[in-house]
Structures are given as C-alpha cells and as structure tokens.
A protein has these predicted regions:
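A short, compositionally biased
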Residues: 19-23, 48-52
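Helix-rich interaction surfaces within compact, conserved domain-sized segments
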Residues: 65-108
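Acidic surface patches and DE-rich sequence motifs
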Residues: 29, 48, 58
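Short, surface-exposed polybasic-and-hydrophobic patches located at secondary-structure transitions
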Residues: 51-72
Length: 108
C-alpha cells in the first residue's frame, strides 16, 4: 500500500517538465520564448497519438508539444501536476507557440 509520504515523493515522469500544482503554467518554446497562462484559462486541449503531439489552445494562441512523452505530460497537466515544460530532446522534442492572428493583420 502506498503511503501519503510516498505519494508526495514519487519519481518524476520526465525531466522535460516540472512537477507541481500551479496556478500559472509556463511553456518554454524551442526559440527560448516563455509563455505563462493561468491553468484554468485553457480553452481546448487535444492529444493526437499518431503524431505524438499535444495541442493546448488559449486565447492568444495554441501551444504545440511534440514528443514520445507528450501524452504523459498531458496526463500530468490535466491533473494539475505540471508547472512548466520545455523540450529536452528525448521525452519532449518540441514546444512551439502558434499565436492567433489579429483581425487587423489578416489578409483579405
């Protein structure tokens, strides 16, 4: 039987993301940009297994996380067990941000 102490000290699932219970989740992109969003501001999330890719949509754009452990990150994320994520080249291969286009920037 697992004790409460053991639950609090379980090993990290990956070095690519930081465990914790956040109010703000931080995404560090491949380009070095850092985006922070309130955890509950997520509009939509989808994991696509055939591409090992997770899409997290926020008001300003979509965070795209790719890699063999993207689904495990998603599982931790939805349980509020992840504070930040960045590519480590092994478990998470890429973290990118696709910003929403502003109305005035759209080409007609």
């Amino acid at each position: 039987m697992t004790t409460l102490r053991e639950l609090g000290t379980r090993p990290r699932r990956s070095q690519a993301w930081e465990p914790g219970s956040p109010e703000i989740v931080r995404f560090i992109t491949d380009e070095g940009a850092s985006y922070g969003f309130l955890w509950h501001a997520l509009i939509f999330g989808a994991y696509v297994p055939e591409h090992e890719t997770l899409f997290l949509q926020y008001g300003t754009g979509t965070v795209i996380i790719a890699g063999p452990k993207a689904e495990e990150f998603w599982e931790d994320f939805i349980q509020r067990k992840a504070i930040s994520v960045k590519a480590d080249g092994v478990d998470i291969l890429s973290v990118t941000m696709s910003l929403r286009q502003r109305k005035e920037d759209k080409v007609e």
